C-alpha cells in the first residue's frame, strides 16, 4: 500500500470522512468546528481514506494548527518540520510527545479549558435574569472598535462576526461594558470568547457580566459553554470556577516563531 509522504488540501465535500479522526473534545473544538462548517485549511494524507489530518486556522499572532493521527506517519514529521512563521501547535495524545522531537525549537506552554461537568450540568449554574443584556446585530459593529480583535479572530472582522456568529453584550447605564461571542462550535460545545472592559472589572462586575452573557448564550443554544485560557491566568481560572465551569481540561501547546 502506498503511504503519502505529504499532506494535501482536501475538498469540503469530503470532510465527513474526517469526523471519526477529530474527536469532540474541548482542546479540539476549533478544529472540529472548521470541519463541521466546511471551511478551508484542512490537509490530509489521502483524500479517499485519510489517516492523518492537519487543520490550519488563522489567529491574530499567525496561525494555529491542530494535528490528528498516528505519530509514525511520515507525512506528519515532514509537515511540521516545514512550518514557518508564528504557529501554535496542538495535537492528540499520540502525536503531542513527538512535536519537540520534530521541532526542538518549539517553546511549550499549558492551556486550560473549563466547561460544565457532564453530570448535573445546571445544578450550580443559575441563569440570571437577562437585565441589560441583548443579542448584537450587524449594525452594532461600530460599537466594538474599542474591544480586542481576538474576540472576532475566527471571523476576520466584527461585522463578519455579527453577520455569521452569535454575540451578546452587557450594558450598564447604556454603556456597552462586556461582550461574549461564540468563537467556534461543535455538536456539544460552544467555545466562548468573552471580555469585560477594565473599569467594569475594577468595579467588581466582571463575574456578573460574564454570568449574564453565558446564561443568554446557553438559553439560546443549549450547548456546553467552553472557556479557554492560559494555565497561568489565575484570574480567568477563578472566574471560570465561580461560574460553575468546574470540568477542567489541560492541553499542551507548542509555539513556533
Region spans (language model):
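Short amphipathic alpha-helix that is part of the acyltransferase structural core
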Residues: 1-28, 119-155
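Acyl-donor-binding surface of acyltransferase catalytic domains
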Residues: 29, 38-42, 46-138, 254-255
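A short helix-loop-beta-strand connector motif used in the catalytic cores of GNAT acetyltransferases and
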Residues: 34-50, 159-169, 190
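Conserved acetyl-CoA-binding loop-helix of GNAT-fold acetyltransferases
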Residues: 73-79, 196, 202-219, 237-242
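Conserved active-site alpha-helix within GNAT-family acetyltransferase domains
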Residues: 95-107, 207, 231-249
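A conserved beta-strand-loop-helix scaffold within acyl/acetyltransferase catalytic domains
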Residues: 156-198
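Conserved hydrophobic beta-strand within the GNAT/NAT acetyltransferase core sheet
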Residues: 192-194, 225-229
